């Protein structure tokens, strides 16, 4: 009976996926029905006649993963359990202990603490390894760790953690505090206001509005809105933030799709808080989605000068769709477009090279015009008016973080040399050299198509005992290692900043990172200089 249910579920699920993934053929119902019938028969014949016993659910999961891999990474399937866990996390009754954790070397490690939250007050420290939650052991194979940690506000959770090979169990109250979207705002020298926005969570626009009101009361004559490292969030919050600086009924962003019902326009609905304060928006390669909507709209409307590095380029819109048995698919339904008509999406997942890599949209970037007639370009995210970025072949920064090289090095440094004063803190070149040496001594991938193909060639050559091929691949591998060294030198400043931020966060929380940036940061200093020269500021917007 169970097997029949599994098979029925598998067929229904596959049918729905086929309909969804054949979106460009929605009017060709015969073709859709034909493909569903073929898949149904294929799936049935395999499960009924294959020489070995098959697992319908596993076969279906493999098929689903392969199908979705042909689309984009944002179109994802969620099982019934995944959906229920997500609902629980979004519930107002579900709160945590105020810490970020991730598995490092198969150990659940505390990577960040929120100031004043229960984990922080209870003595947990960055780098501690969590072994048990309410007596349940956790390891790299554990799923739903956040569900174990979370619960109703003020409920108690028992945590067993290890520090310096010493195990300790403590009880923490789930306090429900959430990190602010605006961790810092301040009036700087020369009456320049500064607002850091880390996410577009619910209420983010109210936090920005409140900060702006304080700064205007203090007679701020210019404003820096820092969206660096902001991954995005709720679209309406982005629209409401832009509304603080532009008139009512102004188009901020639109979505366009092959399906008419997904074509929408988002316009401002309120009177602005400040129409004329000189405004600068800071972005970098980790500013994405809603961050790019804010930066792009203010740039298109010539309301702000954008400074920093080219943004991430995430301009795709997703919407969840229910599936049978409580499952769900979050599917890309449309693209974001800024007021000038440009799309900020960097990668075109419908266009792939022969090697299988995704082509960049900016290869065919079109020119668009701002309100004042300035040239701006579509594809590849938001290009700053003042570009402080360095041209790089690889996303080395992302790779260093992904492999936990930055966190592990910063933790070791923090334990040996705890930062006591932000004003006196500065990493020397010797620290960079040691970090580079440590990283290069480890085997890590630049995640290029070339490297992936070389690895496959090396493995195949070993299996077939082709010594000459193995030697040739080794030569290519040496060349790639030299490329890594070149990238380290090229990105030295960015890497030192990244290490500094991680070390400071361990001593002074996320708020300290922004405090330190105000002391000596290239992007902020560039913004302050520009706001001190309003003639040049105005010229950049013409």
PLM segments and residue spans:
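Hydrophobic membrane-insertion alpha-helices, especially the h-region
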Residues: 10-24
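Short linear motifs in exposed loops
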Residues: 112, 141, 171, 332, ...
């Amino acid at each position: 009976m169970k097997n029949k249910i599994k098979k029925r579920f598998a067929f229904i699920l596959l049918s729905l996926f086929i309909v969804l993934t054949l979106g460009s053929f929605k009017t060709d119902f015969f073709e859709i029905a034909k493909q569903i019938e073929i898949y149904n028969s294929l799936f049935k014949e395999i499960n009924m006649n294959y020489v070995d016993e098959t697992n319908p659910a596993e076969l279906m999961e493999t098929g689903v993963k392969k199908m979705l891999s042909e689309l984009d990474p944002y179109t994802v399937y969620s099982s019934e359990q995944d959906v229920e866990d997500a609902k629980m996390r979004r519930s107002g009754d579900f709160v945590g202990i105020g810490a970020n954790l991730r598995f490092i070397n198969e150990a659940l490690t505390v990577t960040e603490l929120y100031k004043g939250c229960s984990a922080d007050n209870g003595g947990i420290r960055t780098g501690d390894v969590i072994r048990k939650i309410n007596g349940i052991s956790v390891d790299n194979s554990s799923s739903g760790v956040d569900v174990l940690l979370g619960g109703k506000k003020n409920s108690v959770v028992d945590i067993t953690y290890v520090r310096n090979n010493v195990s300790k169990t403590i009880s923490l109250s789930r306090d429900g505090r959430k990190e602010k979207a605006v961790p810092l705002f301040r009036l700087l020298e020369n009456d320049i206001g500064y607002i850091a926005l880390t996410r577009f969570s619910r209420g983010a626009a109210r936090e920005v509005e409140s900060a702006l009101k304080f700064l205007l009361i203090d007679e701020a004559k210019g404003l820096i809105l820092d969206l660096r490292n902001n991954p995005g969030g709720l679209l309406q919050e982005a629209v409401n933030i832009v509304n603080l600086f532009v008139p009512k009924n102004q188009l901020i962003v639109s979505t366009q799709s092959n399906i008419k019902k997904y074509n929408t326009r988002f316009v401002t609905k309120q009177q602005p808080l400040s129409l004329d304060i000189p405004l600068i928006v800071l972005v970098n390669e980790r500013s994405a989605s809603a961050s790019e909507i804010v930066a792009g709209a203010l740039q298109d409307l010539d309301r702000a000068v954008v400074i920093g590095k080219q943004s991430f380029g995430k301009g795709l819109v997703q919407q969840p769709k229910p599936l049978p048995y409580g499952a769900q698919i979050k599917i890309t339904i449309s693209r974001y477009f800024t007021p000038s008509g440009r799309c900020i999406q960097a990668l075109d997942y419908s266009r792939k090279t022969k090697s299988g890599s995704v082509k960049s949209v900016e290869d065919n970037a079109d020119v668009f015009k701002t309100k004042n007639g300035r040239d701006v370009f579509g594809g590849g995210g938001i290009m700053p008016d003042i570009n402080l970025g360095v041209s790089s072949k690889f996303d080395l920064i992302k790779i260093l973080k992904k492999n936990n090289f930055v966190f592990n090095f910063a933790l070791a440094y923090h334990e040996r040399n705890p930062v006591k004063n932000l004003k006196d803190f500065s990493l020397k070149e010797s620290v960079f050299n040691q970090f580079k040496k440590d990283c290069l001594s480890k085997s890590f991938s630049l995640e290029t198509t070339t490297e992936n193909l070389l690895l496959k060639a090396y493995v195949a050559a070993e299996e077939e005992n082709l010594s000459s091929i193995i030697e040739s691949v080794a030569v290519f591998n040496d060349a790639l290692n030299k490329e890594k060294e070149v990238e380290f030198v090229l990105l030295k400043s960015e890497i030192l900043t990244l290490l500094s931020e991680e070390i400071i966060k361990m001593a002074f929380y996320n708020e300290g990172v922004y405090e330190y940036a105000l002391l000596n940061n290239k992007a902020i200093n560039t913004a302050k200089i520009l706001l001190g020269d309003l003639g040049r500021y105005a010229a950049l917007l013409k």
